[in-house]
Amino acid sequence: MALGGLISNRNFGSFIGSGNGCQRLGKSGAEVSKLFPNALLCRNHQPLQASLHHESGHMRRSFGCFLQPRMDSVIRFRNSIKINRSRAYYKSEESDITEGVVPSADGSAEAILVEGNLQNASPWWQQFPRRWVIVLLCFSSFLLCNMDRVNMSIAILPMSQEYNWSSATVGLIQSSFFWGYLLTQILGGIWADKFGGKVVLGFGVVWWSFATIMTPIAARLGLPFLLVVRAFMGIGEGVAMPAMNNMLSKWIPVSERSRSLALVYSGMYLGSVTGLAFSPMLITKFGWPSVFYSFGSLGSIWFLLWLKFAYSSPKDDPDLSEEEKKVILGGSKPREPVTVIPWKLILSKPPVWALIISHFCHNWGTFILLTWMPTYYNQVLKFNLTESGLLCVLPWLTMAVFANIGGWIADTLVSRGLSITNVRKIMQSIGFLGPAFFLSQLSHVKTPAMAVLCMACSQGSDAFSQSGLYSNHQDIGPRYAGVLLGLSNTAGVLAGVFGTAATGYILQRGSWDDVFKVAVALYLIGTLVWNLFATGEKILD
């Protein structure tokens, strides 16, 4: 029986042989009769004439499946083989073989099998785009980043009771994280641009995870040890954003840039939600040290996955397909790692200063809301501490949702032909003017529910910044994306430190309306600077 009669209803592969293959042609043609592990048999319809053509090993590789041929009986002649019966077993499903003509005199020609329209050739997880594997790994690292950061805000309550810390001491402990965090913003960008994002981000996660695990031990040793460990944790987390930005600038094409960054940054928001939700449960059941031990241990699991699947750039990934490489690179060649940072050139560009100033204005309002929100809910809206804690989760959830919506909108606008400059200005204007509007309404609302809604809408519109200034570093200088983010985020962290302290000073002498007015003023300044000087064009090469 011919193989063509056994395998049907699927387009599986094709025969080629000397430019042509095998095809049934009635009595004057040839047909496929038998496949051996290392050979292909073509037979014409002349009596007892058959030819066996070997294709050592290559046939199986190009066929791309498991074929187990079996021959029940073969009668051998001096120059031919007569097939009484043959079978081929395909271990997945039946398939057709595309056939062609063999123009040789005896009905035979050298033939091989080539891979055709294979379906389900590999598991779905192997077909998943490699660039989005990198995005998901960065997303999960940012999830861990904020889980490990916010757990102290919950654990500090039982810790301060156990060790009799004053409010001033608690404030010192909370601020010690930023000592280290500030140190590695620019350094993290330099290291990532020189040595690759994989090394730097992997180092950062291991470093801050170890510091998280060491926190209970340091607290028992004494306050100075705890301050050092918290500063060390800040050092590790400080490299995360520059290293991530460096990697995505190499892995993600511009048409997917906004949504990929939005997804990664939403990991931070969801990390805060997860940390705020699970920390009280762990503390109640196992004690406050359990929060640090459990959250910190998750970093080791992430690091193993990072070592296995992450690469600093597409050219380092041996499993990256040529098709995906073309999508990522868009016809351009991958650049060599940065050896010298052109600081004078970078700092001479107005769009760079637009990034720095806008990042400062953005983070002033964001840090104030996220730091002082529980106090506002408790003192002004008269929610109890439990209610305040639950309501603090709402803005983080809102930001996670709207960051991804904004990313999708931005990439859609780019794909439809709107310039990157206009897209970045539109998205960041929403990220500035939205919070400014909703914060200005807080003095006019009459109910706590409306106040909570205004706060949530403020943070939701703020999340559009992920497709504005947070995506712009890769636009204007992809080779220096890590350094650029380190520069602007340093300004952002300083805004958080000074803004948080200034809010306390304002509240001692004024009101919450004054706090919100300062934030609104900075949002408006940021809008003006951004729209005057920002660009989406590459200015650093």
From Swiss-Prot:
GO function term, MF aspect, one: L-ascorbic acid transmembrane transporter activity
Tissue expression profile of the protein: Expressed in stems, developing siliques, leaf mesophyll cells and sepals of mature flowers. Not detected in roots. Detected in palisade tissue rather than spongy tissue from the leaves.
Pfam annotation, one family: MFS_1
Gene Ontology CC terms: chloroplast; chloroplast envelope; chloroplast inner membrane; plastid
Keywords: Chloroplast, Membrane, Plastid, Plastid inner membrane, Transit peptide, Transmembrane, Transmembrane helix
Signals that turn on the gene: Expressed with a circadian rhythm showing a peak during the middle of the day (under long day conditions). Up-regulated by light.
Transmembrane stretches, start-end: 133-155, 170-190, 199-219, 221-241, 263-283, 286-306, 352-372, 390-410, 430-450, 481-501, 515-535
Transit peptide start-stop: 1-28
Gene ablation phenotype (knockout): No visible phenotype, but decreased reduced ascorbate content in leaves and decreased xanthophyll cycle for heat dissipation of excessive energy in photosynthesis.
Activity control note: Insensitive to dehydroascorbate, p-isoascorbate, inorganic phosphate, glutamate, ATP, p-aminohippuric acid or tetraethylammonium.
Localization, UniProt: Plastid, Chloroplast inner membrane
Membrane topology: Multi-pass membrane protein
GO BP: any one term: xanthophyll cycle
Main location: plastid
Function: Inorganic phosphate and probable anion transporter. Ascorbate transporter bridging the chloroplast envelope. Transports ascorbate from the cytosol into the chloroplast. Requires chloride ions and the presence of an electrochemical potential across the membrane for activity.
Official protein name in the record: Ascorbate transporter, chloroplastic
